[in-house]
């Protein structure tokens, strides 16, 4: 399988997963033109579109793509029913496309109906989990987002996180403000800066590394709890406080 990232809009990534037969799956096409360009250049034929949630920057390209490829199915959560999805999905559903099995994981938080798709080793998680960060709580609660992330971190270390935005450097800047002396975060920030200087993506990110550099995955660590100065040492309170701090950062 070939994983292809397509920069779109201001900070989005659209993902393509292609097989040896030149067939591919399109994930979260926020706009159509860059997708069409890549499909033409690489000679790929889409077999399906996968949507993670209903925000326009993740599905704005669906109508134009369907005009060109009218027969391909569009999968998504219930909240995308009126946004182009033709087949609605829920927790536990499985899709078999391009010789790959995609498992559906419900991950409410960023939106109430947000889902992720896992096809080892790839995790297409939209705006739930970013490298060194997590999504804003536009509709859901901190409890929901925390539980969603707990689901995702049960996946194997070699999981590749294919997030919906290139937010890595800003997330690492926030992480350094909390843990300025953390060597892993400092090293990853340097590596991310080098990639940006070469106009290269920081994604996909390895889940094994995220366990070390993503504060939102480290809420059970007593060291982080003390560093934040929170008097509530339960992981959910730490997560909620971190999310509020990031919103103000």
UniProtKB/Swiss-Prot annotation:
InterPro entries: Clx_II_MBL (IPR035680), Glyoxalase_II_hydrolase (IPR050110), HAGH_C (IPR032282), Hydroxyacylglutathione_Hdrlase (IPR017782), Metallo-B-lactamas (IPR001279), RibonucZ/Hydroxyglut_hydro (IPR036866)
Gene3D superfamilies hit by this protein: Ribonuclease Z/Hydroxyacylglutathione hydrolase-like
Oligomeric and partner information: Monomer.
Provenance organism: Hamiltonella defensa subsp. Acyrthosiphon pisum (strain 5AT)
Enzyme Commission (EC) number: 3.1.2.6
Function: Thiolesterase that catalyzes the hydrolysis of S-D-lactoyl-glutathione to form glutathione and D-lactic acid.
Keywords: Hydrolase, Metal-binding, Zinc
PANTHER family: HYDROXYACYLGLUTATHIONE HYDROLASE, HYDROXYACYLGLUTATHIONE HYDROLASE GLOB
Cofactor note (record): Binds 2 Zn(2+) ions per subunit.
UniProt binding sites for Zn(2+) 1: 53, 55, 110, 127
HAMAP family registered for this protein in UniProt: Glyoxalase_2
UniProt-recorded Gene Ontology molecular function terms: hydroxyacylglutathione hydrolase activity; metal ion binding
Reactions catalysed: an S-(2-hydroxyacyl)glutathione + H2O = a 2-hydroxy carboxylate + glutathione + H(+)
SUPFAM superfamilies, A to Z: Metallo-hydrolase/oxidoreductase
Pfam family, one: Lactamase_B
Annotated positions binding Zn(2+) 2: 57-58, 127, 165
Pathway entry: Secondary metabolite metabolism; methylglyoxal degradation; (R)-lactate from methylglyoxal: step 2/2
Name this protein carries in UniProt: Hydroxyacylglutathione hydrolase
Annotated family: Belongs to the metallo-beta-lactamase superfamily. Glyoxalase II family.
A biological-process GO annotation: methylglyoxal catabolic process to D-lactate via S-lactoyl-glutathione
CDD domains on file: hydroxyacylglutathione_hydrolase_MBL-fold
